[in-house]
Regions:
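Alpha-helix boundary/N-cap detector
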Residues: 61-68, 132-136, 140, 155-158, ...
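Amphipathic, membrane-inserting segments
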Residues: 29, 84-92, 99-111, 121, ...
Length: 276
């Protein structure tokens, strides 16, 4: 009987033929900016050549730049903004944000290129704010005044230094009473407890209010603040402190000054709020 040979390839043999053909095929040049799909032994493989990494320059500007003063904000905004850019002022966070590629009236844009002015409070402001309303020992209060002589306006620094030294000089005395003088000063009566002066009485006169000059934000305008003296006498050591008058209002005023300066330096309105 005559035998016949089956020349039909098995599935495995067919795949080998396909793989061999693919390997033997000449490489094809792909065009940047397009997406390709290829059938491979493992399935369909996609090659995406639309990304910015394949281009000479990015398709659009992205990223958020943070600056710390008004001049830097205006310089960056002037370089990158267009007629549809938007600016938002957040009075709670003391920030001004520019959305440089904001939506236009008739079309959406990415909103991914931004500049943020993040104001920083000065060290002097933070230190005065940290001790605001807190009572200190005589030594601590005197040292605080000495450390902050440059900010003391009324009485002047020299007078306040004398007051600080007077407070330190009676640190061991026992204070008994305090009275308000017609001059607006406070007179605190004390009795010495140091052995050499034990029993000797004296008086310490200090201002009821004093004025400090503080710059709330780095690179910003300075403001005068009134500080009211606070003290506590418990028939022993004297505790002293101060209470600033309406410091939150000063911060808001300082921030509004920054917003006004920016508004005068750009051609788009500054909106009150935050951007999405």
């Amino acid at each position: 009987m005559t035998s016949y040979r089956d020349l039909t390839a098995t599935p495995g043999e067919a795949q080998v033929i396909v793989d061999t053909a693919l390997l033997a095929a000449a490489p094809a040049e792909l065009e940047i900016g397009k997406v390709y799909a290829f059938r491979t032994p493992a399935g369909v493989e996609k090659v995406d050549l639309t990304g910015d990494q394949y281009k000479d320059a990015p398709t659009r500007k992205t990223g958020t730049t943070t600056v710390r003063d008004t001049a830097s904000f205006l310089a960056y905004f002037g370089k990158h903004a267009d007629a549809d850019s938007e600016v938002y002022a957040d009075a709670e966070r003391f920030t001004v944000t520019a959305v440089l590629d904001a939506n236009t009236a008739g079309a959406a844009r990415w909103g991914g290129h931004r500049a943020v002015l993040a104001l920083r409070q000065t060290d002097a402001w933070k230190q005065w704010a940290a001790s605001d309303g807190k009572l200190m020992t005589q030594e601590q209060f005197a040292e605080f005044l000495e450390d902050h002589l440059p900010e003391l306006l009324e009485p002047d620094a020299a007078t306040m230094l004398e007051i600080a030294q007077s407070i330190q000089g009676v640190a061991k005395a026992e204070f008994q009473s305090g009275t308000r003088l017609n001059s607006g000063e406070r007179k605190l009566a004390y009795v010495e407890t140091v052995t050499a002066k034990a029993g000797q009485k004296g008086e310490l006169v200090i201002p009821e209010t004093f004025v400090v000059g503080l710059v709330p934000f780095e690179g910003g305008e300075g403001f005068r603040l009134t500080a009211r003296l606070r003290y506590r006498i418990n028939g022993g050591p004297l505790q002293l402190g101060y209470k600033l008058e309406r410091p939150a209002d000063v911060l808001r005023t300082a921030f509004q000054g920054v917003v006004t300066e920016i508004s005068e330096g750009i051609t788009v309105p500054v909106l009150n709020g935050t951007s999405v």
